[in-house]
Amino acid sequence: MDAMEFFRNSSGNWRSQRTTHHLAFRRAETGTSEIFVEALGADDQKIVEICEMHDCDPAKAVGGAFVRWESAMAWDKEDENHEGTTVFALIPDEDNPQQGLLLRERGYAEIVPIAGRYHIDEEEALVLVTEYETMTTIERFWFANPDMRLRTSTVQRFGGFNTATYCTEMRVKEENTVSASPAPAYEQFCGW
């Protein structure tokens, strides 16, 4: 599997349940997300624009993905908003197409255009490593089956890990899509 095949397999609507461990506080927080993924071809205007934004030759891109999400976390305050969109563009290394440059118009940890690295590991998981000005994020996505995707991520700030997250993402049919709602703290023990 290559990264574009991973994005094509990820296309559609997903419902995510996650637990984020705030390591410095020794506390865990649960949350839910509604996620939409659309694989984009190399000639898609969004891919061309992201490449140009990062001063990269669009002809080197193999495609990418558009992602939209709406999320809620158990500790959210009333005015907190966890929703947005981003576009990923993939530019594989010339000597190894299983890894390369990942361009984003918007990062997750910091809302700025960002370039990171991606690779497909030996278990066909997509691994994204993004270095921000004040932190590093490492995300790993893999499929348990075609309708169940798993994700882990860590955020390291100033030399120490401060969050670790585990997500279970289930594919949903269009008619079953609902908005994310705050997850009670006990939900992690209740299943779906």
From Swiss-Prot:
InterPro entries: Calycin, CpcS/CpeS. Its EC number is 4.-.-.-. GO terms for molecular function: lyase activity. Transmembrane segments: none annotated. Keywords: Lyase. It holds the Pfam family CpeS. Covalently attaches a chromophore to Cys residue(s) of phycobiliproteins. Belongs to the CpcS/CpeS biliprotein lyase family. This is Chromophore lyase CpcS/CpeS 2. It comes from Synechocystis sp. (strain ATCC 27184 / PCC 6803 / Kazusa).
